[in-house]
Amino acid sequence: MRIAASAASFGILLAGCRADTVPPEQLQRQGREVVALFEQSCAANGGDSTKVTVWAESRQAQKLVADEVNKLPPGMMESGVQAVWRIQKDGADYYLGLSPDSCSVKTAKADENTVRQQFEELVKRGAQGANVELRADNAAQSPFPIRQLSYAWRPAGSGSETVLTANTSTSDRLPVQAALMLTHQVYHSAPILEQD
């Protein structure tokens, strides 16, 4: 399943031990900002690549060339990413990525509790009449602490859903402490039954 794969890829790659420390207040600001950017870019535009691109250009985000993307820490971007923008705010870098089936916003440092709280508020606020369904609330401690919170927006009776996922960590040994992702998938409420 895509959700489990995103959590696994988030936790597998390391950038080495990071010695830089960020004050708690700044981590909270960065937690609020990463969710706000995700809401404005990915969620508000349904992950549509054309709309997300227009949004990034309107914000004068710096579009990265392939060489710059390749120099990002492992795990900062998904394999197969087609476009990446860097947004800098208050000394922090946020990366907006578009892949064929997803839209993501990530940052190296953010307060985990702030990200999760803001993410849950976004999920409820942004549903616009769709059903909000919890898909995952997982935690792992080994090899590093990682938490995953995933919800789906699904209009009543729809055969597809929009899945919003927040992968977070408190570990300074991971290159990304907050990774927010939007994907679309077919909704499977029950096994398909064959009739004879």
Predicted regions located by residue number:
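Bacterial signal peptide processing site
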Residues: 18-20
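Long, charged/polar, surface-exposed segments that mediate recognition or autoinhibition
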Residues: 81-149
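Bacterial N-terminal signal peptides that target proteins for export
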Residues: 1-7
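C-terminal motif of bacterial Sec signal peptides marking the signal peptidase cleavage site
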Residues: 14-16
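Terminal, regulation- and interaction-focused segments at domain boundaries
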Residues: 22-51, 95-117
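Glycine-rich, aromatic-bearing surface loops/beta-hairpins
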Residues: 142-196
